[in-house]
Amino acid sequence: GHASIRSQASSRIFIGKVTENSNGYTLRKGEGESTLMEYKTNVGQYHACGVSKQSMGAVIWNVRWGDDSCFESHATQPRATLIDCCSGGFMHWRQGGDSAQMPNHMENLTIWNFYATNAQTDQDIDTEGKFTWWDGNGFWWKFMPPIIVGFHGSPLDFDDTQMKRLESNGTAVEPYSLYEAQLRKRLGYVPSWLSSLK
């Protein structure tokens, strides 16, 4: 398959407790059948759960996607997305988007306590092996500086000059879920519908 669940041109969407673990071929950068590599279990959709078009205020919560995938951020100006306590692959080039519709994501992409089961950089754009968010030499890889807190699992270094905030890289933080903590602060409790999804 090509894509999982996404918030497309919508506002205040919650996508939670989704598990996507399809089998298939791992991919390398390129076009056509030459990109297919090895057949494996739990590869996942090319684009995992995420956002597209003018999505605003989406929460992707407690989602598990495949090891050769990554969250979707399919351009045309999505903004203010929280990827909260999710796990799966963190692979370059899986976000998507037409070169005429860049950037992949505008302001306020927040990735909180992400557990990477597999991480990949791209030697063509990642200086010194550090994950790059804005490729100044290409057309397809453009993210405004994100906020990443508590990234852990497979190690990955990020280019500090392209980050709005980077904290606790390599170690999960408390609260484990930023979304739950915000609800608790605003409402005084975590709604039962959310607790039932744990």
Residue ranges and their predicted role:
Residues 1, 9-24, 31-46, 53-69, ...:
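Right-handed parallel beta-helix
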Residues 25-44, 128-130, 137-140, 169-170:
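Intrinsically disordered, low-complexity coil segments
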Residues 61-64, 68, 79, 84-198:
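Catalytic domains of carbohydrate-active enzymes that cleave complex glycans
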